[in-house]
Design a protein with these regions (language model features):
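C-terminal secondary-structure termini that scaffold catalytic or DNA-interacting sites
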Residues: 1-3, 62, 186, 222, ...
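Short, Arg/Lys-rich segments that mark the N-terminal edge of DNA/RNA- and chromatin-recognition modules
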Residues: 1-39, 88, 228-236, 240
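Short, basic (Lys/Arg/His-rich) helix/loop patches that form interaction surfaces
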Residues: 4, 128, 132, 182-193, ...
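Well-ordered beta-strand positions in beta-sheet-rich domains
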Residues: 35-39, 175, 224, 258-260
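N-terminal core-binding DNA-recognition domain of tyrosine site-specific recombinases/integrases
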Residues: 38-42, 62-66, 70, 74-159, ...
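A short, charged, amphipathic alpha-helix used as a generic interaction element across diverse proteins
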Residues: 40-57
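Basic, Lys/Arg- and aromatic-enriched nucleic-acid-binding interface segment
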Residues: 132-140, 151-215, 220-221, 232, ...
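Short functional hotspots where side chains directly engage DNA or cofactors
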Residues: 160-162, 222-230, 326, 337, ...
Length: 386
């Protein structure tokens, strides 16, 4: 074995038919020398690899040639992700890794994962019939995980962030007409969830947001209510409980989603009536009542299961002659009706809790055609005459 060292290089030597090189990284906690090794067919190839490796080390990045993508993702899910996102989102990320990322990329070495590898995965998912939005979620999860690798200094770049992002076409859901909305409200009048449905329709609220409303968030004098929480059903990680899922009342994730709604006098009056009705239900329930401070609770005060609420709403919609509807369609309906009444797009965006007005525009921008036409006609009249 012959050992040679060139000017400005780390150690390079020939081992049989191949050339090998090593770079000194320092010492471990036991005082042992730590080196990073590379190999190639020619001395020049090894020298170039060492040069690139030295550049990464000088920048604070030390690639780990041993860890696989799956091992890294598992470590990220177990140690880095918890506490940074909602529990339901954490469950979704675990499922995305288990079902999509680990099977396709898991056996690859993390340091050798390329943009092409990731792009090929997205294409394979498209060929398998997955929607652009589903692939976008997969890309988001991988990008966030690899960002942790960058922070740790074991990745020089984020290949997921550099991969081709799928184009997602936002689609507007089915919406109620004014007449249908009135028919629904007439049908639900007097029902225990009439105010919940009114709020969901008037402000385009998600069902979890409606069910997460707290009495403490209602300002009776100002006539406002603050959205701060949402009710969701998530996986139960406590194996001793024997349950697969559990209900949680969690804080809304983003600053834009935590928002204040201005109530009409009619809605304030409806809420007062509901408050009185709930006080009577509390007395009737006696010791069974569990006070969570929720505006829309079960008959014993506990959080209402969103799926049960959906079932109740669907039955009421059918009773109103509308057929099968889902509560989320009240959100689309509320947004569409607000825009139809001339509410400015940025106001609708704030009421819906979108993170940016661009999202609102992508989903509901086509409803503004009449506004654009009116603006064009006004400008034409001002500039060119009637």
């Amino acid at each position: 074995m012959t050992k040679r060292r060139g000017s400005g290089e780390d150690s390079i030597y020939k081992d049989g038919e191949r050339w090998r090189g090593a770079i000194h990284l320092g010492y471990d906690d036991k005082g042992r020398r730590v080196r990073k090794k590379v190999s190639g067919r020619t001395r020049a190839e090894v020298a170039e690899k060492l040069r690139k490796l030295r550049k990464l080390v000088d920048a604070g990045t030390v690639p780990d040639d041993k860890i696989t993508v799956k091992a890294f993702l598992d470590r990220w899910l177990a140690h880095s992700l918890p506490g940074t996102v909602a529990e339901s989102t954490e469950d979704d990320y675990n499922d995305t890794v288990r079902l999509h990322l680990a099977p396709a990329l898991g056996r690859k070495k993390l340091a050798k994962l390329t943009v092409l590898d990731v792009d090929k995965l997205w294409q394979a998912k498209r060929d398998a019939g997955y929607s652009a939005n589903s692939i976008r979620i997969m890309r988001t999860v991988l990008r966030k995980a690899l960002t942790q690798g960058e922070r740790e200094g074991i990745l020089p770049r984020n290949v997921a962030a550099l991969s081709a992002a799928p184009h997602v076409v936002a689609k507007e859901g089915r919406t109620l007409t004014i007449d249908q909305a009135k028919a629904l409200l007439d049908t639900v009048a007097g029902h225990r969830f009439d105010v919940a449905i009114m709020l969901a329709l008037a402000y385009g609220l998600r069902r979890g947001e409606v069910l997460g409303l707290h009495w403490a968030a209602v300002d009776w004098d100002a006539g406002t209510v603050r959205l701060t929480h949402s009710v969701k059903r998530i996986k139960d990680r406590d194996k001793a409980s024997g349950r697969k899922t559990r209900l949680v009342v969690g804080e809304l994730k983003t600053p834009k989603s935590r928002r204040t709604l201005v109530l009409t006098p009619q809605l304030v009056a409806k809420l007062r009536t509901l408050h009185t009705r709930q006080a009577k239900a509390k007395i009737a329930a006696g010791e069974l009542w569990q006070d969570h401070g929720l505006v829309f609770a079960s008959e014993i005060g506990t959080p209402m299961d969103p799926d049960n609420f959906s079932h109740i709403f669907s039955k009421l919609a059918k009773r109103a002659g509308l057929g099968h509807w889902h509560p989320h369609e009240l959100r689309h309906s509320g947004a569409s009706l607000m825009l139809a009444q001339g509410t400015p797009l940025h106001v609708v965006s704030e009421i819906l809790g979108h993170t940016s007005i661009a999202i609102t525009k992508d989903v509901y921008g086509h409803l503004l055609v009449d506004d654009k036409r009116a603006a064009a006609e006004a400008m034409s009249g001002a500039l060119f005459g009637a």
